[in-house]
């Protein structure tokens, strides 16, 4: 209706109730931990995503999560280049503040470095998360324009990304 894209980003260091498993993968207990650990208690694939989905739902007061898509960072250059590059502002982080500069169009490995680099400052995860939100919003805008111009492009992109992705959302749900 508003034709706007909103991104809800959850910092990997957010503390919430997560299920804890033993070394054999058996449920041990529920405790408070970093939300990113929920994924680590799984197999790195569907099991990890289901456990992360549960932790996110717990964080959001049992809000049902209808689906997930975990995409390996190695897919970023391919996705980025498939839409002709993504334009984002230059971002610098200093003294706890993000400063925005001139726009830059990221291609290939530059896109990967933009969304992946975290640094080692105390609040580096927050800075990276902000960069990822900016990037994702710009990417989604480009993808929507691409789909409007050629509706089949979303199917092609989905198929290209599939080897890098674990999801419970099938291509028909993406296209309709």
Feature annotation, model-predicted:
Residues 1-176:
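Non-catalytic, solvent-exposed segments at the cell envelope interface
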């Amino acid at each position: 209706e508003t034709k706007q894209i909103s991104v809800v980003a959850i910092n990997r260091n957010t503390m919430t109730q997560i299920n804890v498993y033993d070394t054999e993968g058996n449920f041990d207990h529920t405790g408070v931990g970093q939300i990113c650990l929920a994924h680590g208690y799984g197999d790195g694939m569907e099991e990890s995503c289901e456990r992360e989905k549960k932790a996110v739902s717990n964080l959001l007061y049992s809000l049902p999560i209808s689906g997930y898509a975990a995409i390996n960072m190695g897919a970023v250059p391919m996705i980025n280049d498939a839409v002709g590059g993504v334009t984002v502002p230059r971002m610098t982080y200093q003294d706890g503040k993000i400063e925005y500069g001139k726009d830059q169009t990221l291609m290939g490995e530059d896109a990967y470095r933009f969304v992946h680099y975290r640094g080692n400052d105390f609040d580096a995860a927050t800075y990276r998360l902000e960069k990822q939100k900016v990037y994702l919003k710009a990417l989604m805008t480009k993808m929507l324009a691409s789909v409007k111009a050629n509706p089949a492009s979303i199917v092609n992109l989905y198929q290209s990304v599939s080897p890098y992705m674990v999801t419970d959302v099938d291509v028909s749900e993406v296209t309709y």
